[in-house]
Amino acid sequence: MAIYQIVEIGSEVLREKAVPVKEITPNIEKLLDNMLDTLYDANGVGLAAPQVGVSKRVVVIDVGEGPIELINPVIIAKEGEDLDDEGCLSIPGITGQVARAAKVKVEALNRQGELQVIEGEGLLARCLQHEIDHLEGILFVDKAKKTQRR
């Protein structure tokens, strides 16, 4: 296992649309493992592959209920609205209020290549949307109503 360096705002890869994963190879499995190690090392709740310099549609999340691994995630349903503060491992020291859907349903592949549906609300819904935005080259500061130093 390895801890990746988290790339910060200003890095080109954070503004690119990430490439879909065509095949789940041992390298993708290793990426998932190392991303989870990196997430836990950084005390984060979510991490997208572009944040570690890899332009792939891969996300890992753990909001305290165990790890969730998502390959090629797509939001298929949204409900309600929630305004709350967000931060980002790629934008240290900054928080901002961002409006997000209160509930989401996401389809993605797991590391076995099986299609899974994840339903989330609260922090999980916010984290799913935030990380999927990373795959589109969108950062939370692009959507924030206001930002502040923490």
UniProtKB/Swiss-Prot annotation:
Fe cation binds at residues 88, 130, 134. Keywords: Hydrolase, Iron, Metal-binding, Protein biosynthesis. Signal peptide: none annotated. The keyword Glycosyltransferase does not apply. The active site is at residue 131. Its cofactor is Fe(2+). Gene3D superfamilies: Peptide deformylase. InterPro entries: Peptide_deformylase (IPR023635), Peptide_deformylase_sf (IPR036821). This is Peptide deformylase.
